[in-house]
Amino acid sequence: MSRFFRRRKYCRFTAEGVEFIDYKDLNTLKNYITETGKIVPSRITGTSARYQRQLATAVKRARYLALLPYCDNH
C-alpha cells in the first residue's frame, strides 16, 4: 500500500460553474502557466478537456496582446 493518499484531481472551472475562461483574467491564467511560461497540462491540473482548450486559447490570446509573457525573463 502506498504511504500517501493522493487526492483526486478535479476541474475547478466545472466546480465553480464557469461558462467561459476570459483572457483578461490574468490571476486565473497565471495559475495555469509555469514560471517559464508554458501551459500546464490537464493531467497535472485536473482540468477537463473542454476547459483545457479554452484555457490554452485564453493564454495564447493574452500572450499575443502582451498581457502574459511568452517565456521567462532571461
Swiss-Prot record:
Keyword terms of this UniProt record: Ribonucleoprotein, Ribosomal protein, RNA-binding, rRNA-binding
GO-annotated biological processes: translation
Pfam assignment, any one: Ribosomal_S18
Gene3D superfamilies the record matches: Ribosomal protein S18
Example of a GO cellular component annotation carried by this entry: cytosolic small ribosomal subunit
GO function terms (MF aspect): small ribosomal subunit rRNA binding; structural constituent of ribosome
SUPFAM superfamilies hit by this protein: Ribosomal protein S18 (SSF46911)
Quaternary organization: Part of the 30S ribosomal subunit. Forms a tight heterodimer with protein bS6.
Family: Belongs to the bacterial ribosomal protein bS18 family.
Cited function: Binds as a heterodimer with protein bS6 to the central domain of the 16S rRNA, where it helps stabilize the platform of the 30S subunit.
The name this protein goes by in its record: Small ribosomal subunit protein bS18
Native organism: Thioalkalivibrio sulfidiphilus (strain HL-EbGR7)
